[in-house]
Curated annotation (Swiss-Prot):
Highest classification ranks of the organism: Bacteria, Pseudomonadati, Pseudomonadota, Betaproteobacteria, Rhodocyclales
Annotated organism of origin: Dechloromonas aromatica (strain RCB)
Enzyme Commission identifier(s): 6.3.2.2
Top EC class for this record: ligase
Keyword Nucleotide-binding included in the entry's annotation: yes
Stated name of the protein: Putative glutamate--cysteine ligase 2
Cited Pfam families: GCS2
Alphabetical list of InterPro entries matching this protein: GCL_type2/YbdK_subfam (IPR050141), GCS2 (IPR006336), Gln_synth/guanido_kin_cat_dom (IPR014746), YbdK (IPR011793)
Amino acid sequence: MTTKALGDFKDSAAFSLGVELELQLVSKRDFDLTRGATDLLGSLDYDERFGEIKLEITESMIEISTQPQSTVDGIAADLSGLRDTLRQHCERNNIGICGGGTHPFHHWPERRICPGDRFNDLYQRYGYLAKQFTVFGQHVHIGCTSADEAIWLTQAFGVYVPAFIALSASSPFVDGVDSFYQSARLNAVSAFPLSGQCPPLGSWQEFTEHFAFLQACGIAQSIKDLYWDVRPKPEFGTVEIRVCDTPLTIEQATSLAALAQSLARWLLRTRPPLHTAKQAHVARYNKFQACRYGFEAMISDPVNLCQTPLKQTLADLLEAVSEDARELDCADWLSPLKQAVAENTGDAAWLRARENQHGNLNDVVREASKRLMGKNDQFQEKTK
């Protein structure tokens, strides 16, 4: 096994931001997934002014990633530019792009692994799981000023994993049927052996020792093998939140980035006790609750030994970070999240409403593709 050294943590500007979105490539004929990623990227004439457009593990996916930004408005501008650039090139190739955490009806054995040593290694190592990993997430990077701060923030964000899952949930359909989940995507991620929560590590030194142990045991080659819900990213100088489904719009993706930035500031400003060891006992259950029930989840509190409605927790969270959002000049971006919680709306509900209207999932994907691409659509009203 060839291992890659962890390297030093590259300090970043406090609360700087970056966003990655994994997007679906769909056929304009039947809106099933298509296999055009390599050809699309090969024909792309783009100067990377807004960030990167790159391959993901299968030919039915494409990833866009913003430039590092100091503001949420900068993230919004990059995502809009990336989306518009990709849309223009996709239209020339008769391909649609679409958000959502899962494609509602694709058949995973039909997926083709993208060329590249890492992708091939993943396929050889994990077999069919690599093709089933054709799911689509949003990752948010938050800049940290030191390595120890990054580890503390990784642990602190872990408590809020259910909040980000519920607010981003957009994967109710799997294999052509309603999964009854709000976010079914994370079930595909959970199959990998190094998924889940970061262990209770208290410093960068403890993290480097833990990672060296995993390498020595032959478990991990590089930090990319850690599919944790939240993980440090030393080469970027960030903490990366990895549990969000790809939303149906770039506006929603931007709102989630605003919450991550505001929450990071609030956490580092107030330094609440983390109770990391106790939280570890309930993390998996709380994650399931958020995936299955979304805003209706009941979250277990290992400190007060009770359960709390996630909807109330979300409302309290959005209120708690409001001062920090104002200081970061991103308060307006939190308004859609507050409205979604208050009205019990979201992308999963929108997708189910479209399926209920049409009675088929092809038209659901067609409308979802329009929604991501920013085209006028009579069905873009909020769904209760």
